[in-house]
């Protein structure tokens, strides 16, 4: 592959801006294309929980999850909810989702692939933050998982597989939990701390800083919505936008949940779906955790950010266009109050902020990282689901390696877009 190509990167989220930085490092010219502000409220990265969980190697679907589907359909406020009106459209994706976690062997295969992608992610993000002049936004201080009992932990397939792929952790009994987290509800009597993991103090500000760093390093930003990719034979000639064409030698599709239309325009109808996520944030709370915590029973991450105490999590399958169900954010708020009983229940509404966005998700829990079938000038980098922020650092490196014709630093076969084609 020739060096010094003009690369158009569609999407200025975490994956897109880091891909831009790494492509510039390889000597390419870069144009970022996005209608929104990098790191703005419209972006999935903005509302991210802020966990840099290099141990998040377990896909959402696990053996036996099919038994829970009726409950997901009946409970619009559960950890995973499926809107009836969207079910016909989501059904093909849901079937692939269930099959991907049908056996433990399949889940284990996914875990090994994700471990390759996520290993050392907090360190990679720290280096990027230092380059961008915002080292204070990335902390590598470990994260805690809280369980009601040791039995809940022992019966969790995910932790057996994490051990298998090389994740280490520190185990805490009830007394040690109280010492570390005195304000956490005493119903949590067992915990594990994954010391290799970290957190981002402000995901939106981090992505904005990375975008500014890319621009300062020579990238350009075009505020437009990309609608397609223009080929001449097997050669890419332009990215098509609502305001015109942008000539380029190569393109990266990193448009998150809106990547599906772009891949279809070049003959790759990929099964990308949006897992809608919510967060609630309390500004200047009176109490809270000392560290970042995931509550196993609530399926919710609680993390301190520069803007306040943020609780994020759960999944809603309802597509890109449906209005948000803000009761799901209220459930997160109630879980937060339950986890930390000393939080006042009369916090003014003006101090409680809610948000919702779209996780771009492939049914098997693995992103698409690789070339389009129609042209090796097109690189796909989307579909990270729950590991978009943490996985973006290595994904950007892989994108730059693919653009330059270099050997990728990890095996990319598990992430190949052709696995569903």
Swiss-Prot record:
FAD binds at residues 12-15, 47, 64-65, 225-226, 359, 385, 388-389. One of its GO terms (molecular function) is FAD binding. One of its GO terms (biological process) is D-amino acid catabolic process. Keywords: Cell wall, Cytoplasm, FAD, Flavoprotein, Oxidoreductase, Secreted. The keyword Amino-acid biosynthesis does not apply. InterPro entries: FAD-dep_OxRdtase, FAD/NAD-bd_sf. GO terms for cellular component: cytoplasm; extracellular region; peptidoglycan-based cell wall. Its EC number is 1.4.3.3. This is D-amino-acid oxidase. The lineage of its organism: Bacteria, Pseudomonadati, Pseudomonadota, Alphaproteobacteria, Hyphomicrobiales.
């Amino acid at each position: 592959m020739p060096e010094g190509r003009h690369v158009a990167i569609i999407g200025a989220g975490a994956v897109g801006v880091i891909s831009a930085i790494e492509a510039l490092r390889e000597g390419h010219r870069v144009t970022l294309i996005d209608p929104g502000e990098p790191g703005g409220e419209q972006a999935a990265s903005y509302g991210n929980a802020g966990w840099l969980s290099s141990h998040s190697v377990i896909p959402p679907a696990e053996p036996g999850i099919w038994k829970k589907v009726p409950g997901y359909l009946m409970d619009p406020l559960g950890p995973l909810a499926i809107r009836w009106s969207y079910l016909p459209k989501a059904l093909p994706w849901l079937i692939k989702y269930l099959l991907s976690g049908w056996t433990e062997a399949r889940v284990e295969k996914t875990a090994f692939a994700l471990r390759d992608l996520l290993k050392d992610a907090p360190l990679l993000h720290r280096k990027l933050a230092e380059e961008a002049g915002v080292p204070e936004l990335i902390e590598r201080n470990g994260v805690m998982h809280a369980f009601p009992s040791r039995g809940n932990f022992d019966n969790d397939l995910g932790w057996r597989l994490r051990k298998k792929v090389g994740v280490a952790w520190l185990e805490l009994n009830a007394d040690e939990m109280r010492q570390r987290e005195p304000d956490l509800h005493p119903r949590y009597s067992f915990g594990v701390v994954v010391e290799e993991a970290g957190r981002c103090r402000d995901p939106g500000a981090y992505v904005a800083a990375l975008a500014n760093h890319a621009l300062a390093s020579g990238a350009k930003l075009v505020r437009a919505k990309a609608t397609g990719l223009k080929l001449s034979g097997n050669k890419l000639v332009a990215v098509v936008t609502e305001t015109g064409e942008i000539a380029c030698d190569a393109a990266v599709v990193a448009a998150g949940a809106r990547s599906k239309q772009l891949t279809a325009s070049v003959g790759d109808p990929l099964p990308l779906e949006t897992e809608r996520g919510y967060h609630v944030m309390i500004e200047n709370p009176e109490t809270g955790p000392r560290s970042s915590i995931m509550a196993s029973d609530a399926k919710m991450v609680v993390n301190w950010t520069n803007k306040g105490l943020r609780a994020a999590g759960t999944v809603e399958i309802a597509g890109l266009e449906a209005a948000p169900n803000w009761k799901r954010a209220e459930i997160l708020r109630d879980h937060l109050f339950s986890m930390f009983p000393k939080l006042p229940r009369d916090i003014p509404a003006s101090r409680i902020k809610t948000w919702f966005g779209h996780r771009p998700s492939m049914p098997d829990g693995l992103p698409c990282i690789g070339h389009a079938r129609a042209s090796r000038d097109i690189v796909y980098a989307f579909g990270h689901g729950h590991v978009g922020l943490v996985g973006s650092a290595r994904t950007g490196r892989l994108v730059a390696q693919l653009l330059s014709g270099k050997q990728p630093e990890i095996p990319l076969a598990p992430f190949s877009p052709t696995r569903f084609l």
